[in-house]
Amino acid sequence: MTTGLPSQTQVIELLGGEFARAGYEIEDVVIDAHARPPRITVIADGDDGLDLDAAATLSRSASALLDKLDTIEDHYVLEVSSPGVDRPLRTPKHFRRARGRKVDVVLSDNSTVTGRVGETGDDTIALVVRAGRDWAIREIPLGDVVKAVVQVEFSPPAQAELELAGVGGTDKTEERRK
């Protein structure tokens, strides 16, 4: 008989290398020992997102590695998932991966800005925002961001907006900054 589930740290240490070789990183591990059967959820992301095929491949690899642990219970549910659209964007890497996506950003002065994520540096993000009837780029220091969440869109964005974000054809970013 086994003694229980591995810790979050053990799961990250065990699976981190395998996920990294596949081009993904583990963002979080949630272990629910109270669920029946117990559940281990691994949240992973990569520069190009995590599609269903990659999640299935990672899940098979993770299951094989976890099954080798002598501390794990006989029956458990393993889930490998992407962070989802409701995950707050916190790091430059999160913003880079969200390039081209529409976000709501709460700033340290309690103002809110809605825009499309453009180029992200180590200390700033460029948001494509409405400027009257046109589009403009607003540079925001990451230190001023209190909260940022990707918004679900039900209609396609304007081509000019995508181009300014650097994801829709010609890159007019430098032209609009002048």
UniProtKB/Swiss-Prot annotation:
GO terms for biological process: ribosomal small subunit assembly; translation. Keywords: Cytoplasm, Ribosome biogenesis. It comes from the Bacteria. Signal peptide: none annotated. Gene3D superfamilies: RimP-like superfamily, N-terminal. It is found in: Cytoplasm. GO terms for cellular component: cytosol. The keyword Cytoplasm applies. Belongs to the RimP family. PANTHER family: RIBOSOME MATURATION FACTOR RIMP. Required for maturation of 30S ribosomal subunits. NCBIfam families: PRK00092.2-2. HAMAP family: RimP. This is Ribosome maturation factor RimP. It comes from Mycolicibacterium paratuberculosis (strain ATCC BAA-968 / K-10) (Mycobacterium paratuberculosis).
